[in-house]
Amino acid sequence: MAEERINAEQVQHVASLAKLEFTPDQLAMFTPQLEKIIGMFEELSTVDTTGVPVTSRMSDHTNTLREDVAVKSDEALREALLKNAPETANGLIKVPAIIDESGDGE
């Protein structure tokens, strides 16, 4: 059998760092999938790329975004959108905090 690259405990640890919770069944499903993905990366790392120029993007297109200009929104549309939000505050959609500022890194 091939050497184990990743185990369920490691998958659980990474999941907790990402603030994800997996059931034991999900861990059993994801662990071999991640094992396979890591194996694919290991296979790619064996490819000789000598002479291949470094690439940071697959396209020559850059800065294709629109100009950043504030425009007044349609108030009726805004109200309709906010009506669908579970919680709002001061005309904005209120979402739960996702960044832990306790400083413990967990």
Swiss-Prot record:
Catalytic activity: L-glutamyl-tRNA(Gln) + L-glutamine + ATP + H2O = L-glutaminyl-tRNA(Gln) + L-glutamate + ADP + phosphate + H(+); L-aspartyl-tRNA(Asn) + L-glutamine + ATP + H2O = L-asparaginyl-tRNA(Asn) + L-glutamate + ADP + phosphate + 2 H(+)
Protein family per UniProt: Belongs to the GatC family.
InterPro entries linked to this entry: Asp/Glu-ADT_sf_sub_c (IPR036113), GatC (IPR003837)
Record's keyword terms, sorted: ATP-binding, Ligase, Nucleotide-binding, Protein biosynthesis
Subunit comment: Heterotrimer of A, B and C subunits.
GO molecular function: asparaginyl-tRNA synthase (glutamine-hydrolyzing) activity; ATP binding; glutaminyl-tRNA synthase (glutamine-hydrolyzing) activity
EC top class named in words: ligase
Coiled-coil annotated residue ranges, if any: none
Catalytic activity, EC: 6.3.5.-
Gene symbol of the encoding locus: gatC
Name listed for the protein in its UniProt record: Aspartyl/glutamyl-tRNA(Asn/Gln) amidotransferase subunit C
Biological process according to GO: glutaminyl-tRNAGln biosynthesis via transamidation; regulation of translational fidelity; translation
Keyword Ligase: yes
Pfam family membership, one: GatC
